Amino acid sequence: MRTERIAAVLLAAGTSSRFGEEDKLMAVLRGKPMAAHVLETVASMAFAELIAVVRPIEFAPVIHRKLDRRGYTILVNDQPEDGISGSIVRAVEYVMPNNKIRGILVCLADMPDVPQTHYNRICLAAEDIRSVVASTDGFSSSPPAFIGRKHFPELLALKGDQGARALLSHGIQIETTGNILHDVDTPEDLPGWRPITPE
């Protein structure tokens, strides 16, 4: 499916509870905040819309500014303790009225190593509004993932931190090479990390 029919949804509202006191999305990786790697890669593609679900601006002012500069519509999840499902629900509620959107590409801000080529593979494997296309490391299904419009009602009923895992496990699986699906949950997951000073 052409990216022009897809809304990219960047999930960046987690509480980073396992990362300690620092905001993991602001941890420096290769010279810039970790989240910047994902938001810039996704913004460089021709999606119908760029949507980011984030914490309130007082908790993540730098991320808000970077997203705004790159043209994202910012949706605030003021209850991040509800888990990833709450963020997905907010994004789907926003997208549903636009019938030109055939599906969403769910991306995680704590997966900084996913290249544009992989996002493209996910989108190209999506055929229509019934499609579900997930990434896999050969063991489990995960984002980045395409979820077609037909499944939006199911997404609106999600609860908790498992997100759309059950739905993704039944979709087309795009296997990755290397460690590109590595997500950062603790400081140890990010070699040489250091907190960034807010602008």
Q: Where are the model-predicted features located?
A:
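Conserved alpha/beta core of the MobA/IspD/sugar-nucleotide pyrophosphorylase nucleotidyltransferase superfamily
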Residues: 1-5, 153, 157-199
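Bulky hydrophobic/aromatic packing residues
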Residues: 77-80, 94, 151, 187, ...
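Nucleotide phosphate-binding site architecture
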Residues: 16, 27, 152-153, 191
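Conserved nucleotide-sugar donor-binding
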Residues: 140-153, 187
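Nucleotide and nucleotide-moiety/phosphate-recognizing core
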Residues: 2-141, 170-177
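Short aromatic/basic micro-patch
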Residues: 113, 146, 183-184
